[in-house]
């Protein structure tokens, strides 16, 4: 049976301090070419100012993002289904109103 100290020696002998960087594209090819350069081009979000799209958000928008981020997958899918149903219903309503406008000749250009 092995002594308790042998496990630590074995573990120490298995450690490797070799740096596995992408210096050799033949040994370590990128799975998606260009991703490393793309990721390196962005500054750390901690040190840089917020992105342009976030500067335009209001508090209600941020609260909605936090709420959506806290939903489970099933709840998020239910929310998406509800939004799809609402968009479909709005499309039907718009179609009805456009047909109504056509029958009432509201959309015709006036004749000169």
Swiss-Prot record:
Gene Ontology, cellular component aspect: DRM complex
Stored Pfam families: LIN52
Tree of life domain: Eukaryota
GO biological process, one term: regulation of DNA-templated transcription
Disulphide bridges, residue numbers: none
Cross-referenced InterPro entries: DREAM_LIN52
Binding partners and assembly: Component of the DREAM complex.
Family per record: Belongs to the lin-52 family.
PANTHER family on file: LIN52 FAMILY MEMBER (PTHR31489), PROTEIN LIN-52 HOMOLOG (PTHR31489:SF2)
Protein name (database record): Protein lin-52 homolog
Organism (species): Gallus gallus (Chicken)
Encoding gene (name): LIN52
